C-alpha cells in the first residue's frame, strides 16, 4: 500500500512538474497525498517527519535563504566569471522573441501562428515593381564587375534619385521609411540580379550613420544629415573594424583625446582623433564617415572619468587629414570598400552622434542597432541568392541534356536540386518571420545572429551545389555566367557583421543562454547588487525558479522521449503534426541540456565553444523549423507545397538530433553520457534524413513551372530582357517544354530516336516530311537558338582579360603604335 501511494505521489508531482505548476501546488499535492495515505494506513509519523524535514526549510523563506541559498550564492559568485561592460552591453541589447519560447522547452505553437504575416504596403509594392525592376534592367553585371569594377555612373545616380539609400530613413526627413520586410524584398530582388548592386544598397540601410542618427542623433544632426542622406547628396559609411580589432570589435585601438583646439576661429573643447580602419564599405566614395573610437579625457576637461569608452562621431570626409579613396578588392565582387585613416584630426564635441552626453555610449548604440540590421541585410541578400540559383539550376537541369536525357533526371543531380529547393523555401520563411518580428517592434539580437549565420551558410552551400549541377557552365566566367560572381563572393557574407565561426561558437548560444533563459540573467545580475539582503532575495527567487524549471524540463524530456512525443499538443492534426511534436521534444531537450551544461562546466562554459556551438545549433534549427511551419500556415497550408515543408523540417530536425547526440558524446563523464543517452534517446534516434523519393519530388518541382515554383520565385528578378540571364533562361525552359511534343512527334513519325539537339535540323526534317507545319518548325528552330544560348559559355580575346597595370600598358602600347 505504501509503495502504491509513493508511486502515485511521484506520478502526481511529475504531472505537476510537466505542466510547470508552482511550488505551492506541488506542496499541496504532497500534503493531500500524505493525508489520504495516512487515513489509508499507508503513511505514519516517519513519513510526515521526512516530509517536514524537506518541506519546511524549502518553504520558509527566512530559513531557506539563510541556510541553503546563502552558501550557494557565495559559491556561485566565486565561480561566475565577471562580465565586461562590452559583454553587458551586448547581452542587454535588443529583445527576446520566439527564440525564448524555444529555449524554455515549452513552445506555444498557437502563439507562433498568431504573429501576423508580414505584408507590403501599396507604396512598397510599387517601389519593387517600379524602381527596383528598372535598376535591375539597367545593370550589366559583367560590365560592372569585370570592366568597371563599380556600378556605372547612371546606375549610381538612379539609386540616389530614387532614394534606394533611404529605405530606413523616416519620411519626415525625406526618406522612404519602409518596413523591414519591404527592405528585405527589395534586397532579395537586387541580389537576384547582382550581388554588387545589393551590397551597395544594403549597407547604408543597415548599421550606419542613418540608423544611428535616427535613434541617437541630436535634432540638429538629424535635420542636417538625414535629408541629405535621403536625397543621396551625402554618401555614408561607418568605420568600426581595425587591423588589430576584427571580430573583437570592442578592442579597437583607434582613439580620440579630449583637448582644446581651434575651430572656426575660436578655441573650443573637442577631440583629437587618430584612426586606422579597414574593410569599410563605401569608404572610398563616402562624403560622411561614421567613426567608432575609444574616447579619452586625460586632463579631465569633461569630468572625472578618464576613459570614457567607445564613442561614435560623424566626420566629413573632405576635412584635411581624412584619408579615403583607396580600395580593397573583395573576391571579384567590387563593391566600394576600402581603408580610411586619420591622424590628430580635431573636431568639436558636437560631432559626437547624440552630442557630448553620448560620449562613451558608442558600443551600446552599435549593438542595439546591429540586432536589427543583422536580421535584414545579409540574410535577405542570401535568400535572394539562394532562390535565384535554385530556379536557375532547376531550369538549366531541364534544358541541359547528357546521355539523351535532361541532367535533372539523374539522381546525383536530383540530390543537389532537392537541397536547393528546400533551402529556398526555409530560408525565405526564416527571413520573412524575422523581419516580421522587427516590424512588430522587436530588436531580436539572438534571432538576427541565428539567421545571419545559417542563411549565409545555406547560401554558401547552395552555390556549391549549383556549381556542381552546372559543371563547366558555372566555371567559365563571362557575360553568360550567372553563378560565378556569387560563388566567388560567398565568403564575404560569411565573414562580415560577425564572422560565422565566431557567431556559431560564441554568439548564438552565448547570448541566447543568458537572454532567453528565464532565470540565468537574474542570477547573474544578483551578483552585482551591492545590498546583500536584496541580492540574496533576488538570487533566492531566481534560483528556486531555476530549480523548478530544470525539474520540469527533466520530466518533460523524459516523457516526450519515452513516448516519442506522441501526446504532445499540436495546433494541427494533419501531416505537419509530427514536426510540431518532435520540435517540442527537442525544445525540452535543449532547455535541459542547457542547465546540465551550465552545471557541468560552470563558468568555463563560455570557453567551451564547441559545446556552446552545438547548443546554439539546437536553438537555431528549432527556429528554422518554426519559420517553415509558420510560412506553410501563413500561405494557406497548400498541399502542393507540403513536400518543401516536409524536406525542410526533416532536414532541420535531423540537424537538431545530430547536435544533441554530439553534445551528449562530448560530456566529460561516461556515466553522465550513458544516462543522457538513455534519457534523451531511449529507443534510438527518431529522425531520419529526407528520403530519395521526397528529394525526387523537390528536384522535379524546380524543373517544371507551377504555382509552387512561382511562390519560391517571389521577389526574384525574372523579367525576360537581354541583360537578365536567369530571366531569359526561365523563358527558354517554358519554350523547351512547349516544343518537346513536336520533337517527339518527328521522332515517332520518322521511326528514329534522335538526341535533343540540332533542333533546327529536326525542324527541317519534320517540315520536309510534312510532319510539322511551318509555324511548328519555326518554333522548334527558335528554341534551338535559345537552348544554345543557355548551354554555351564565353570566350575572349586575350587582350580583353588584361586588368590593372597590364591593361594600361597594353593601351599605352597601342597608343604609341598609332
Model segments located where?
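A short core secondary-structure module
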Residues: 266-322
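A glycine-rich, basic-preceded beta-loop-alpha segment at the flavin cofactor/substrate interface
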Residues: 339-374, 391-408, 554-575, 586-606
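Loop-to-helix element that buttresses phosphate recognition and phosphoryl-transfer chemistry
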Residues: 412-439, 467, 620-631
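Flexible, small-/acidic-enriched active-site or ligand-binding loops
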Residues: 320-346
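Conserved phosphate/anionic-ligand binding catalytic regions in large, soluble enzymes, centered on
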Residues: 173-175, 382, 386, 465-478, ...
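C-terminal amphipathic alpha-helical interaction region
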Residues: 545-818
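Charged, glycine-rich active-site and insertion segments that engage polyanionic ligands
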Residues: 442-474, 643-656
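Amphipathic, small/basic residue-rich leader segments at the start of a protein or domain
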Residues: 5-15, 26-36, 47-204, 211, ...
